[in-house]
UniProtKB/Swiss-Prot annotation:
<comment type="similarity">
    <text>Belongs to the class-II aminoacyl-tRNA synthetase family.</text>
</comment>
<dbReference type="GO" id="GO:0005737">
    <property type="term" value="C:cytoplasm"/>
</dbReference>
<dbReference type="GO" id="GO:0005524">
    <property type="term" value="F:ATP binding"/>
</dbReference>
<dbReference type="GO" id="GO:0004821">
    <property type="term" value="F:histidine-tRNA ligase activity"/>
</dbReference>
<dbReference type="Pfam" id="PF13393">
    <property type="entry name" value="tRNA-synt_His"/>
</dbReference>
<dbReference type="InterPro" id="IPR004516">
    <property type="entry name" value="HisRS/HisZ"/>
</dbReference>
<keyword id="KW-0648">Protein biosynthesis</keyword>
<comment type="subunit">
    <text>Homodimer.</text>
</comment>
<dbReference type="InterPro" id="IPR015807">
    <property type="entry name" value="His-tRNA-ligase"/>
</dbReference>
<keyword id="KW-0067">ATP-binding</keyword>
<keyword id="KW-0436">Ligase</keyword>
<keyword id="KW-0963">Cytoplasm</keyword>
<dbReference type="InterPro" id="IPR006195">
    <property type="entry name" value="aa-tRNA-synth_II"/>
</dbReference>
<dbReference type="GO" id="GO:0006427">
    <property type="term" value="P:histidyl-tRNA aminoacylation"/>
</dbReference>
<dbReference type="Pfam" id="PF03129">
    <property type="entry name" value="HGTP_anticodon"/>
</dbReference>
<dbReference type="InterPro" id="IPR036621">
    <property type="entry name" value="Anticodon-bd_dom_sf"/>
</dbReference>
<keyword id="KW-0030">Aminoacyl-tRNA synthetase</keyword>
Length: 425
């Protein structure tokens, strides 16, 4: 027997039993972001490797360890996108979307990172992202956070999320702090773990994000970033906090919050939850005012966020917040007897034309009515329409309600639509 071919480790199928949850989440995301007036953009899943090296930073874990990179037949180095912001910025520069313009965009799709697969975190994962270009004030920072807060309310998980907030200051302020942090870390080098020692010179801010308790204890005595902020940074952060206070959105200022990518400045934020076991991030974002220029465009302020849909759906399932997801079939048409197959198929087409929101499935493959009714129940249809030879001859149809305590009735085909109209209510 030939060896069975299986999916690649960490890249999972989304089966028919799972897709209704995904569709519900994606529909909620689309509805909310559209209510803010944002437009969808779609980018390719493969980009030139140097895009991510320049955008994310060559000494980040993503670029050093996690990217799926390969050479194509022309010898070009290509990479499956590990995140969406870099590709979105590239597309906006290439097509002239951001020069002296304001843009508010969103996207959703698969991303790829060669990480150790674990629950809610996979090598192919799906990300919903929002990016805004051309706006500098704390008002747009607040709008994105308000948008995410609205998403949690719509999904019924607001009470299980906590907003963590920080500012990284300007690039000059961050550079000054970086030097001070390196000096401090050098004084404690022998006490740092191998990972922190590696990052100490290449990306010292990432040491602040360590999970090692011993290093965390050392960092309690490290210089703080706030000591290096000027008035502009302080005013921006104060303005953001005032807007969030006015909106009633609670937050925790976390001075150790730096995010995992090099391009952030000023505002950074994460939504975290304890509902997935150890505290985990379900959404993160921040400002990246220098990235457009860094990738070859004109200097353009920008801010965005992204959330992983696998972690979000896992959270919904864990908290049992998945409810009122409709079945995939409204009407199941059962047919048995001479001439009923044609009548059933034509009736189904008529219903799809006149009630396009109805999901109509016709039974195929023959079998008696008992077998067909079992199938109707298995697909969780709400109504079965039964066509026998008598019904076809008299241009009638028998209506059987499968989920409601309503008596079965036989009606003229012309009277069927008003009965089915209540399915859309």
């Amino acid at each position: 027997m030939a060896k069975q071919i299986q999916a690649i480790r960490g890249m999972n199928d989304c089966l028919p039993e799972q897709t209704p949850v995904w569709q519900m989440v994606e529909a909620t995301l689309r509805r909310v972001v559209s209510s803010y007036g944002y437009s969808e953009i779609r980018m390719p899943v493969v980009e030139m490797t140097n895009l991510f090296q320049r955008a994310i930073g060559e000494v980040t874990d993503v670029v050093e360890k996690e990217m799926y990179t390969f050479n194509d037949r022309n010898g070009d180095s290509l990479t499956l996108r590990p995140e969406g912001t870099a590709g979105c910025v590239r597309a906006c520069i290439e097509h002239g979307l951001v020069y002296n313009q304001e843009r508010r965009l969103w996207y959703v799709g698969p991303m790829f990172r060669h990480e150790r697969p674990q629950k809610g975190r996979y090598r192919q994962f799906h990300q919903f992202g929002v990016e805004v270009f051309g706006l500098t004030g704390p008002d747009i920072d607040a709008e994105l956070i308000m948008m995410t807060a609205r998403l949690w309310r719509e999904l019924g998980i607001a009470q299980f999320t906590t907003l963590q907030l920080n500012t990284l200051g300007s690039s000059a302020e961050r550079a000054a702090y970086r030097d001070a942090l390196v000096t401090f870390l050098e004084q404690h080098k022998e006490s740092l773990d191998e990972e922190s020692q590696r990052r100490m010179y290449s990306n010292p801010l990432r040491v602040l994000d360590t999970k090692n308790p011993q290093v965390q204890e050392i960092l309690q005595h490290a210089p703080t970033m706030a000591d290096y902020f000027g008035e502009e940074t302080k005013a921006h952060f104060s303005g953001l906090k005032a807007l969030l206070d006015a909106a009633g959105i609670a937050y925790q200022v976390n001075e150790r919050l730096v995010r995992g990518l090099d391009y952030y400045n000023y505002t950074v934020f994460e939504w975290v939850t304890d509902s997935l076991g150890a505290q985990g991030t379900i959404c993160g974002g921040g400002r990246y005012d220098g990235l457009v220029e860094q990738l070859g465009g004109q200097a353009t302020p920008a801010i965005g966020f992204a959330m992983g849909l696998e972690r979000l759906t896992l959270m919904l399932e864990t908290l049992e917040q998945i409810r009122n997801i409709p079945s995939t079939v409204d009407v199941y048409i059962c047919m048995a007897g001479e001439g009923t197959l044609t009548a059933g198929l034509l009736l189904a087409e008529k219903l799809r034309s006149e009630r396009p929101q109805l999901r109509v499935m016709t039974h195929c493959g023959g079998g008696n009515f008992k077998k067909q009714m079992k199938r109707a129940d298995k697909v969780e249809a709400r109504i079965a329409l039964i066509l026998g030879e008598t019904e076809v001859a008299e241009q009638k149809v028998t209506v059987k309600f499968l989920r409601d305590q309503v008596e079965q009735q036989t009606v003229d085909v012309t009277a069927l639509l008003p009965i089915l109209a209540q399915l859309g209510e």
